[in-house]
């Protein structure tokens, strides 16, 4: 950090928090100590929406994320990108909805919840093939390069450098372009949507249901 700042870069730290996938009790205490050791340099944390983490946050109101959130730390909820281990970690659409509504009711400043509530328009959460950077670089999902056993977990033939097949499959499935929430919907993770063993309990898009919940709560 000092080296970056000496070069004129305003550098901060971001860390990730995966309570059910990464820590036993002693390691969690070490993690907490490290967070507070670097408190003045901490910009935010990313939390991972796995099945076990969602269950944990829904049942444990005293979790460390709760503490950090209420101390003003920026929190971003990131989607679980499935691989060959995903059958025990990939949440259902109902579990996604349950955690989204829990965050709306209790942690409305967690992104992307905050963006859904506050913004009229949002960028997609995935680095989709429709995004082109200033230097002309076409953005692609960083996880498209998969091992053969991982690629077998998807409905669509995953291309090494081409998001379009999985984007098209999701956008057409829910007819996103006609949705009243399309401009402020971040669409989630296209690879997670394409996971072969994803359990879909709802007949409707979980993001559409979540945006409707936000409106019904009077937050828009």
State where each predicted segment sits.
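Radical SAM enzyme [4Fe-4S]-AdoMet core and its adjacent flexible, acidic
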Residues: 7-139, 143-152
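Flexible mid-to-C-terminal extensions adjoining Fe-S/redox cofactors in radical SAM and related proteins
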Residues: 143-220
């Amino acid at each position: 950090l000092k080296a970056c700042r000496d070069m004129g870069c305003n550098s901060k730290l971001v860390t990730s928090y995966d309570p059910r996938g990464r820590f036993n009790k002693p390691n969690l205490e070490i993690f907490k100590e490290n967070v507070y050791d670097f408190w003045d340099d901490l910009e935010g944390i990313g939390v991972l929406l796995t099945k076990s983490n969602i269950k944990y946050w829904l049942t444990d109101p005293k979790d460390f994320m709760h503490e950090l959130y209420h101390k003003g730390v920026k929190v971003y909820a990131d989607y679980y990108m499935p691989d060959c281990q995903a059958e025990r970690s990939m949440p259902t659409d109902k579990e996604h909805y349950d955690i989204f509504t829990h965050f709306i009711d209790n942690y409305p400043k967690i992104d992307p919840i905050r963006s859904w509530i506050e913004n009229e328009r949002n960028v997609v959460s995935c680095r989709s093939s429709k995004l082109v950077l200033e230097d002309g670089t076409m953005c692609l999902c960083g996880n498209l390069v998969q091992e053969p056993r991982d690629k077998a977990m998807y409905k669509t033939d995953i291309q090494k450098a081409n998001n379009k097949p999985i984007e098209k499959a999701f956008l057409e499935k829910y007819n996103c372009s006609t949705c009243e929430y399309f401009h402020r919907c971040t669409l989630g993770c296209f690879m997670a949507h394409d996971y072969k063993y994803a359990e879909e309990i709802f007949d409707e898009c979980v993001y559409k249901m979540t945006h409707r919940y936000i409106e019904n709560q009077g937050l828009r």
